[in-house]
């Protein structure tokens, strides 16, 4: 069966501190095609960046009827998206994520061990770190 496979990751240098460089990345794969999306921010947290990566991935999928599997090394994101954790913090992003999720016919969230031998997870990790460094450099001028 055809499915879209997504890997997401975050980076937060000096996590949550004002002026910290942060980044997110997502890698979408479907029928041999691969697309990487990423971005950066200042002063965010690793959790918010991971959530942003998932949100950007979901928003970029145009055909919401194709089954999707989202792999993340964030237990916080995976368990909350699967309904096992309460949405106490970051409610603004959780609302956006849940609204976007409702548009899909089939979407699963799967935890993957980070900083291990999974090439796709390592790819998004490298990209998220690069984005956090780029955001920090841009801020410092």
Task: Describe each model-derived feature in a short phrase.
Residues 1-3:
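Extreme N-terminus of proteins, especially the signal/transit-peptide cleavage junction
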Residues 5-18, 55-123, 127, 132, ...:
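RNase H catalytic domain
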Residues 17-20, 37-38:
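Short, glycine/acidic-enriched capping/hinge loops at junctions between secondary-structure elements
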Residues 22-30:
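Short beta-strand scaffold segments in enzyme catalytic cores
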Residues 29-34, 73-77:
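Short connector loops/turns at beta-strand edges and beta->alpha or beta->beta junctions
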Residues 31-49:
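A short, polar/acidic, helix/strand-boundary loop motif
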Residues 50, 54:
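Short, conserved alpha-helix that lines the donor NDP-sugar binding/gating region
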Residues 137-141:
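Short, flexible loop/turn segments with low-complexity composition
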